[in-house]
Amino acid sequence: MRLSILAPVFGVLLLTACGGSSPSSASLPTVPTSPSGPTTPAAVTITGHLTATSGGNALANVSVDLGGLKTVTAAEGTFSYRFQPGTTSRLTFSADSIVPRSLVVAISQTRGLEVDAIALGSGFDLAFYRRLIRNDYGTPGILQPLRRWTRTPSIYLKTVDEAGEAILPGFLDQVENTVKDAVTRWTGGELGTPTVERGTDSREGVSGWITIKYPHIGATDRCGQAQVAVDGGWIELEYHVPGTSTAGCRVPGYIVAPRTIRHEIGHALGLYHTGDPSDLMSGLTWLDYQANLQPTAHELRAVSIAYHRPIGNVDPDTDPSSSVNLAPLRIAIP
């Protein structure tokens, strides 16, 4: 929705005129003073600079629309507006070279504005981005708003399963080490190394935490599941794998493969399945040699862009007008 620039508010300045006295005893009549006209607020200037989200290169020849006022970015990616002040207005960018971009900006005072847009080409694949970030593989055509963390989550690592049975310390060490690396690796350092606390309790529903837990009776069709970017959410790892399981979770040397842990952390950070067997977030059955798979380069490229957008950003690249609350989603993997 595009918001028009608000009309300026005019104030009226009231002046009081006082008559003087002459040397004579007769007073001169007071001459009435006409009221002043309306005062026009000083114009404000918005000076902007448009760059690529990945790489930071200037984006030239991009059409700009601010509240219905149009211009084009210069060779250096710059643009400028001068008008009467308002409050906020929607700013949009469009060109064959970028994914259309839209955001809301304040226009109440003179200011500089740094904006970035997703440049097409150079390895960026919009269809892949929609699968990984908007769940277009899991629910084709029903694109999700962006979900992510805005601060580094703390991890609560349960030391017992859901029935109270103790978990092997060596397995807990593996999970902790994998999680600490995965959070920073997935986000390219946008999130730091998480604090990990161990115990028999839970931090589900507690803001700032992700709880890692283990069902007492293992599932037969998956190796894990997680809520997608839920503050106070959880990850389940299938520590107890039934003999009837068709998921193929166990591999030599691991109770739960490192790739499964990294995959579930990906969900907890806001990612979905891609359907590509070469990806860590594929959501497909994998082979033993992939048990220690790391995120691929094109997965990391897409996540880096997503972590430069606010929660609630919608397709193709439109920021919300205000903060949003999103209902929890849960994703399971084979």
Predicted regions and their residues:
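C-terminal motif of bacterial Sec signal peptides marking the signal peptidase cleavage site
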Residues: 14-17
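Bacterial signal peptide processing site
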Residues: 19-23
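Short Pro-Gly-centered beta-turn/loop motif in secreted/extracellular proteins
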Residues: 29-30, 80-90, 107-109
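Disordered inhibitory propeptide/activation segment of secreted metzincin zinc metalloprotease zymogens
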Residues: 31-38, 96-173, 309-334
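Short, ordered, surface-exposed loop/turn motifs in non-cytosolic proteins
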Residues: 44-47, 52-68, 176
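Short, acidic Ser/Thr/Gly-rich low-complexity loop/linker segments typical of extracellular
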Residues: 60, 65-82
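Metzincin-family zinc-dependent endopeptidase catalytic domain
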Residues: 171-277, 286
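Metalloprotease/metallohydrolase-associated module, dominated by Zn2+-dependent proteases
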Residues: 233-256, 272-334
